[in-house]
């Protein structure tokens, strides 16, 4: 029996790693190759893709997708419906999987509701991205 909680409407695929004390709420999906630390809280409708890393004590609010290439260090807060991208110029007819850019959110950073984080960015330790913001560059510590 796992030492974390998964709501009955959610899925944690084989090959995903989830730390002790983590809670995964309604309609969420953690895919193989995702790593989630201890004591995290994933709200409703959260998707965590392969090759992502989420630290300890991270809170991800409802309707957030953590796409391949995103790393959230310890104590990060992701507000409701914030968005991470992983391709600079997506096109439906062109595969860009080889062009995914890493995004790093450093320890203790806060991302407000409906903010969009452009791939290739680093948000510094304890930085604060306001609700609805689209930071055009890295955010310092």
Label the predicted regions.
Residues 126:
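P-loop NTP-binding/switch modules centered on Walker-like glycine-rich loops
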Residues 2-8, 14-16, 23-123, 131-133, ...:
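Flexible, glycine/small-residue-enriched loop-and-beta-strand segment within the central core
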């Amino acid at each position: 029996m796992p030492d974390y909680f998964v709501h009955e409407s959610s899925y944690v695929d084989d090959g995903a790693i989830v730390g002790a004390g983590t809670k995964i709420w309604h309609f969420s999906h953690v895919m193989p190759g995702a790593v989630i630390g201890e004591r995290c809280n994933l709200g409703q409708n959260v998707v965590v893709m392969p090759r992502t890393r989420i630290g300890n004590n991270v809170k991800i609010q409802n309707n957030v997708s953590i796409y391949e290439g995103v790393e959230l260090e310890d104590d990060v807060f992701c507000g409701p419906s914030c968005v991470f991208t992983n391709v600079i110029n997506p096109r439906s007819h062109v595969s860009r999987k080889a062009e995914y850019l890493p995004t790093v959110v450093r320890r203790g950073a806060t991302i407000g509701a409906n903010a969009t984080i452009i791939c290739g960015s680093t948000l510094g330790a304890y930085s604060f991205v306001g609700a609805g913001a689209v930071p055009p560059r890295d955010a310092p510590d």
